[in-house]
From Swiss-Prot:
The active site is at P2. The gene is pptA. It is an enzyme of class 5 (isomerase). Keywords: Cytoplasm, Isomerase. This is Tautomerase PptA.
Length: 75
């Protein structure tokens, strides 16, 4: 059951853009992980820039070895 949790700075995405993003990500997961559409869930959380350090400290830095795409920045 893949669950994708996207955190990003705020973006002005309308519902159609969010649906297109979800569809594209779903297609990639189906292709690479051989998942069923019904098993995939995707979360989009918009985080204010001044709060990003907390995301880095709790979710990015401790998981650096497990990341399959590492960030090109550090904090």
């Amino acid at each position: 059951m893949p669950h994708i949790d996207i955190k990003c700075f705020p973006r002005e995405l309308d519902e159609q853009q969010k649906a297109a993003l979800a569809a594209d990500i779903t297609d990639v997961i189906i292709r690479h992980l051989n998942s069923k559409d019904s098993s995939i869930s995707i979360s989009l959380q918009q985080i204010q820039p001044e709060s990003w350090q907390a995301i880095w400290d709790a979710e990015i830095a401790p998981q650096m070895e497990a990341l399959i795409k590492k960030p090109g920045y550090s904090m």
